[in-house]
Amino acid sequence: MKTIQIAIDGPASSGKSTVAKIIAKDFGFTYLDTGAMYRAATYMALKNQLVVEEVEALLALLDQHPISFGRSETGDQLVFVGDVDITHPIRENEVTNHVSAIAAIPEVREKLVSLQQEIAQQGGIVMDGRDIGTVVLPQAELKIFLVASVDERAERRYKENIAKGIETDLETLKKEIAARDYKDSHRETSPLKQAEDAVYLDTTGLNIQEVVEKIKAEAEKRM
């Protein structure tokens, strides 16, 4: 079985990270959560009270405190800036509401995309984000474009937040997700869009395992 690159793109809370992790584990591939990288950059900007115009200061912070990944004893992904574990802080609502603005900064994307491409050279990889199939891994053997209704995605995020103890209002989440969809698909640099050769998959009404099986079937055709 040959190793391949699998690119999974889609809007916020479409289930990308959840299915990407499972697929990577099942195939023994590396999983790279690109969204966590942009969240880490956003967390650093907020913590240092930087506004989006302060690009040089943010790039300097990213150099001083490199983003890296690790594993907990239970096998869960950990996210670090420098040697500080920021796995949980980057999922807070404040970071979620600002990440689109930071991710739209061309210099930040350029820096992180370069790092993502470097990691992808190491072999079989599953990467999820907004521009993996179009910008980061345009040569990926399998590209998936995952979508789901705003209502369903808000429900998923609501349940995730409640499970993590993050106070959340469902109607507010719906508005935030719709607003983020607009920002992500209308930004000038690497907007969210389906790659021409991507497999379109609407996950509305499907459970995680059903989505995983559909993607794995597509992957196995290419191995």
UniProtKB/Swiss-Prot annotation:
SUPFAM superfamilies: P-loop containing nucleoside triphosphate hydrolases. Disulfide bonds: none annotated. It comes from the Bacteria. ATP binds at G10, P11, A12, S13, S14, G15, K16, S17, T18. NCBIfam families: cmk. Keywords: ATP-binding, Cytoplasm, Kinase, Nucleotide-binding, Transferase. The lineage of its organism: Bacteria, Bacillati, Bacillota, Bacilli, Lactobacillales. It is an enzyme of class 2 (transferase). Belongs to the cytidylate kinase family. Type 1 subfamily. It comes from Streptococcus pneumoniae serotype 19F (strain G54). One of its GO terms (biological process) is nucleobase-containing small molecule interconversion. Its EC number is 2.7.4.25. One of its GO terms (cellular component) is cytosol. GO terms for molecular function: ATP binding; CMP kinase activity; dCMP kinase activity. It catalyses: CMP + ATP = CDP + ADP; dCMP + ATP = dCDP + ADP. This is Cytidylate kinase. InterPro entries: Cytidylate_kin (IPR003136), Cytidylate_kinase_dom (IPR011994), P-loop_NTPase (IPR027417). It is found in: Cytoplasm.
